[in-house]
């Protein structure tokens, strides 16, 4: 029953539910010969077509039905980006069950907590994760059986995992005569949990309708701009926010899909980019660091790679400039979150921006960007009053839209909405053209003498220094100012830079009082399950750090 008033005169259009199964049916019918290429855990390259994917997805759906999986049941996966994982995406959701992607980079205790909280019925996993599943299986109370994604001859002779089945046996033992059911498009389709950097992870439960609307919007020219002419390699994991929706939006267009499997090092990625003529990719900044280092160290170039979307955390401007100016790769800076399916904004230029000087255009592209249709946003102060869009005033960022959650799974956290808007936890500015720029996570903002200091700008400036590989900025207690910035730096291999040189590097680039009070050098920044820097770990490490100004 709709919550909105019903007109006395309704449109006379066909009523067809927006269901995930319609995407793979469309891909098979109209792009059936187009390729899906995967580097497998087994080590080889696997090739087949959208037609093959649809056929095997239906077989898997029939097998799951035979195991007693019903509409609304949760079926978990723990797998890399690959063809079998794609089949599970469509088989589970297409049958009316709920696909629950598990992040293997979480702590085992968190994985057990999530499977129990989701009440998963089955877990489909890849050979890489056999030891992990053997360790946690006894703590997963609701799982009835485990399905191992591997060739038949790779099945373990014995295992402590109860009711362990072979994925390929299930596929081979069922016919491809399964018919995708029709049901309400608002039915749950997928379940993704937050990374849980503080407290237990919380679940975001997507619907078929929200997923298809997100897929439509994300393929638009001023969003991800995916087309049938592309060869797409998603580096962002399928176990993290559904790989930003690419397993849906790419088949929707019929583009070639290339999956990297477990090999995400610079050389492996580069080799696959070149061999499969990849034109478009997507991933977090830390992944591109490894790829760019490999390319630079071996004096290589890209022959077909022309466009990438970078998100998950703010992309350093120095990286954007390297990709754009040195390698001719268009970088689309994007922003979103698990609670948003995840896409919210993309930084692409409007027509009048091309009249601006090059530096001004670059500044626009460094922002998180403009909303895609379907998403609305605003910034508010701590009282909830809306703040101006002047590009200077920063406030708490709120969003709403048809692919934004209304609550967490099972009501965790209570009523999360603020007057119908979802509070993102980000602090941002919005300029007169509607371009949003994250200045910080609200929990990461440094509060110094009653004023806010955003850490992202400080980190980006540091990473533009040639000797700095990575940087993170945190607030450290100060007897007079409450908090002051401490810059934590990882140097590039074989290069040196002093604290004094780095602090001097800020001169003229920011307000003087924003300049960090101290610099600490470490070997590596702690990285979390989704590729983001774990600032809570850094804060814990430097909790007792005494600033020279204290």
Where are these regions (language model features)?
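Structural core segment of the AMP-binding/adenylate-forming
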Residues: 23-24, 66-67, 94-169, 183, ...
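Conserved AMP-binding/adenylate-forming core of the ANL superfamily
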Residues: 36-82, 86-90, 107-112, 166-169
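Conserved adenylate-forming
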Residues: 64-70, 174-187, 191-233, 245, ...
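AMP-binding/adenylate-forming catalytic core of the ANL superfamily
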Residues: 106, 112, 123-127, 281, ...
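AMP-binding/adenylate-forming catalytic domain of the ANL superfamily
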Residues: 149, 511-532, 549-550
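Conserved AMP-binding/adenylation subdomain of ANL enzymes
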Residues: 212-231, 239-279, 294, 345
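Conserved beta-loop-beta connector loops within the AMP-binding
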Residues: 370-398, 432-433, 495-499, 534
């Amino acid at each position: 029953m709709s919550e909105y008033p019903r007109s006395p005169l309704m449109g006379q259009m066909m009523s067809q539910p927006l269901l995930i199964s319609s995407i793979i049916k469309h891909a098979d019918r109209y792009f059936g010969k187009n390729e899906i290429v995967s580097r497998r855990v087994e080590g080889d390259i696997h090739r087949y077509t959208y037609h093959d994917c649809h056929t095997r997805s239906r077989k898997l759906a029939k097998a799951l039905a035979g195991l007693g999986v019903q509409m609304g049941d949760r079926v978990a996966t723990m797998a890399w980006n690959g063809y079998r994982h794609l089949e599970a995406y469509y088989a589970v959701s297409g049958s009316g069950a709920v696909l629950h992607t598990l992040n293997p980079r979480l702590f085992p205790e968190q994985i057990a907590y999530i499977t129990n909280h989701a009440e998963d019925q089955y877990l489909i996993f890849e050979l890489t994760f056999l030891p992990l599943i053997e360790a946690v299986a006894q703590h997963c109370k609701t799982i009835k059986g485990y399905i191992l994604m591997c060739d038949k001859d790779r099945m373990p002779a014995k295992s402590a995992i109860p009711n362990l089945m072979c994925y390929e046996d299930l596929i081979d033992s069922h016919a491809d005569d399964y018919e995708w059911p029709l049901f309400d498009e608002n039915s749950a389709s997928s379940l993704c949990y937050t990374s849980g950097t503080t407290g237990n992870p919380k679940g975001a439960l997507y619907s078929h309708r929200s997923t298809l609307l997100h897929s439509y919007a994300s393929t638009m020219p001023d969003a991800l701009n995916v087309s049938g002419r592309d060869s797409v390699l998603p580096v962002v994991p399928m176990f993290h926010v559904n790989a930003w929706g690419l397993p849906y939006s790419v088949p929707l267009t019929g583009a070639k899909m290339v999956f990297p499997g477990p090999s995400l090092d610079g050389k492996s990625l580069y080799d696959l980019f070149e061999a499969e003529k990849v034109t478009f990719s997507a991933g977090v900044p830390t992944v591109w660091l490894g790829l760019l280092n490999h390319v630079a160290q071996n004096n290589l170039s890209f022959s077909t790679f022309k466009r990438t979307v970078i998100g998950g955390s703010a992309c350093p401007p120095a990286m954007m400039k390297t990709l754009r100016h040195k390698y001719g790769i268009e970088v689309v800076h994007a922003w979103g979150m698990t609670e948003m399916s995840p896409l919210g904004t993309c930084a692409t230029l409007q027509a009048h921006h091309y009249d601006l000087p090059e530096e001004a255009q670059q500044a626009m592209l460094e922002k998180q960007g403009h909303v895609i249709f379907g998403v609305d946003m605003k910034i508010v102060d701590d009282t909830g009053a809306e703040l101006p869009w002047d590009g200077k005033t920063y406030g708490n960022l709120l969003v709403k839209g048809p692919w934004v959650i209304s609550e967490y799974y099972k009501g965790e956290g209570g009523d999360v909405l603020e007057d119908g808007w979802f509070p993102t936890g980000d602090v941002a500015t919005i300029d007169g053209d509607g371009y949003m720029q994250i200045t910080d996570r609200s929990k990461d903002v440094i509060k110094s003498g009653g004023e806010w200091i955003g850490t992202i700008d400080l980190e980006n400036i540091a990473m533009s220094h040639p000797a700095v590989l990575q940087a993170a900025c945190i607030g450290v207690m100060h007897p007079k100012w409450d908090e002051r910035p401490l810059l934590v730096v990882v140097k590039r291999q074989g290069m040196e830079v002093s604290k004094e040189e780095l602090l001097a590097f800020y001169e003229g680039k920011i307000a003087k009082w924003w300049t960090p009070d101290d610099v600490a050098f470490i070997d590596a920044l702690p990285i979390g399950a989704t590729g983001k820097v774990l600032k809570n770990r850094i804060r814990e490490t430097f909790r007792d750090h005494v600033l020279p100004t204290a």
